C-alpha cells in the first residue's frame, strides 16, 4: 500500500459523522469505531498461516474495521495473498460510502480482495441456520476471522430477532449480544472473533443465556478494558463501560486469558498487561467474567473464590428494598402514629450502624399495603447505589430489631438492599455482624468492583458471591460485638485473623 488505507477510510467516516445529527445515528445504534481502536482490534488476531482467508464484518458501517484488518494483512502477513471479505450493512444512507471505501482498498491493496456487501438483516437472514431448522442451508459459510462493532439498542421481547434466537435471549435482549452470538456461529472451528462491546454482559443474570452460549462454544483468549468511558468511539460523545474481547471458537479451555487495559482508545502504546488463569477470569455456576487489571485483583479473586458457599446455600438472601417512595407518595408520612411504620433510607446508614430517626422528610409510611412492609427483625442493610467517585462500592449498616422494640413492622426504601433469611426466621446478632465484617472488608469491596463495573449493587450478583462458612461468620460477629469497631481497617484485620490464619 502507498499509505495507510485506514487513515483514508477514517477521514471519510469523520466527515460522514459530522454531516449527520446525533439522534439519527443513535436511532440506528451506530457508534463508529475510532481509527486507533480499529487498528488495535486488528492486531489481536492470530492470523492463519494460509494463502486465502475469509473475513466477516457484520454491521460494517463505513468499513473502518474492514480497513484495519486488511491493512494489517497487507503490511505484515505476506503469506496471505487472497482475502474474501463479507460485510453486512442495512443502512442505505451509508452503503454508498462503504462501497466506495472498500473499492478504494481493493485498488490499493497488495492482496487479492473479493468483496461481498449484503444489505440484508444479519440476524434474520441466518435464523434457520442458527436454529438448525429444516430450512437451514446445507452448505453454511464459515469464516476464519470476524471483526465487529455491533449496533447497540434494545429489542422488544417479541421482536423477530429475539424470537429467532431463544438460546441466547432472556426477556427483551440488546441487539449487540445477538450479533456476537451469530458471529461465533459464523466462525470456522478455531476461527477468531474480535468484538468491541459493552462490558455489562460479563455479569448479571439477564446475560446468563448469552454467557452460557458464548463461553461453551468459544473461549476468551484476550480482553482489553478502557479505564475511561470516553474516547472509544470516533467523534461520538458516548459514555458507557466498554471492552474489547477476542474469542476463539473451540471447546478447549486455554490456561490463561491475556487482559490489557488503557486509559482510552488514544493511548494503546501505554497499556498494562496481565495473564490470568482462565478459571479465575471465568468462574462460578453463572460463568461471570472477572475483568482483573492487576496481580492484586487476581489474588482477591483467588481468596474469595476459595470459599464454596454463597448466601442462599446458608439460608440467607439479599433482597431489594420494598418501597419505591416516589411512586407511593400518598403513603408517606412525616410523623409516627399507630398505623405508620419507619421507612429506612440509605441516609439512615451511618458508619456501619442504622440511625433513626434523623429528622428527614417522609421517614414513616402507612402500613396499609402488606407488600411494602416487613417484619421488624435483624437485617444487614447494603446501599444499592453509590456515586462513581465514592471510595467504596459496598456500604453496609447493621440493623438490630431490639433497638426499635416499639415497631412490629418496618419498611425499606428501594435504593437499599437488605440481607434476610429465606425461611423468615431471625438472624442472630452474631451472624448479622459477621456478614457486616465480610462485606465491609476491602477484600469483598474489591471483589465486587471487579465483578461489576457499575455503581449499582445487584442483589442477584451478591447472592452468587461465595462467603465464609456460618461458624466463621458468627466468630467474626462476636469479635465485632466485643470491639464495637466498625471501621474497614478492623474488618480487614479480623477477617484475615479468623478466616485466613
Where do the protein language model's features map onto the residues?
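Class I S-adenosyl-L-methionine
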Residues: 1-81, 86-104, 126, 150, ...
